[in-house]
Amino acid sequence: MDTFESVKAVVVEQLSVDANEVKPESRFIEDLNADSLDVVELVMALEEKFSIEIPDEEAEKIKTVKDVVAYIEANK
């Protein structure tokens, strides 16, 4: 499974959204109806799934699914 598909699976589970709604350009708050707490929980789930740490400064920059994928690819 590639990074996007793995991230997508976490997003679907954490945000309770349909898998078809999760695209690389999907914005968590605007497109997937996440609130700030959802985003924090999503970041924590991604950290656990990929065994990485996403500092708060970096987490604040993550707005879309592709932002997460790029961060994970650069830091794994």
From Swiss-Prot:
Keyword Cytoplasm tagged: yes
Pathway: Lipid metabolism; fatty acid biosynthesis
Residues the record lists as O-(pantetheine 4'-phosphoryl)serine modifications: 36
Top-level division of the source organism's lineage: Bacteria
Any single GO BP term: lipid A biosynthetic process
Domain spans labelled Carrier: 1-76
Main localization (coarse): cytoplasm
Coiled coil: none
GO (cellular component) term, any one: membrane
GO molecular function: acyl binding; acyl carrier activity
Places the protein is found: Cytoplasm
This protein's record includes keyword Transport: no
PTM text: 4'-phosphopantetheine is transferred from CoA to a specific serine of apo-ACP by AcpS. This modification is essential for activity because fatty acids are bound in thioester linkage to the sulfhydryl of the prosthetic group.
Keywords: Cytoplasm, Fatty acid biosynthesis, Fatty acid metabolism, Lipid biosynthesis, Lipid metabolism, Phosphopantetheine, Phosphoprotein
Function according to Swiss-Prot or TrEMBL: Carrier of the growing fatty acid chain in fatty acid biosynthesis.
Family: Belongs to the acyl carrier protein (ACP) family.
Stored NCBIfam families: acyl_carrier, PRK00982.1-2, PRK00982.1-4, PRK00982.1-5
Protein name: Acyl carrier protein
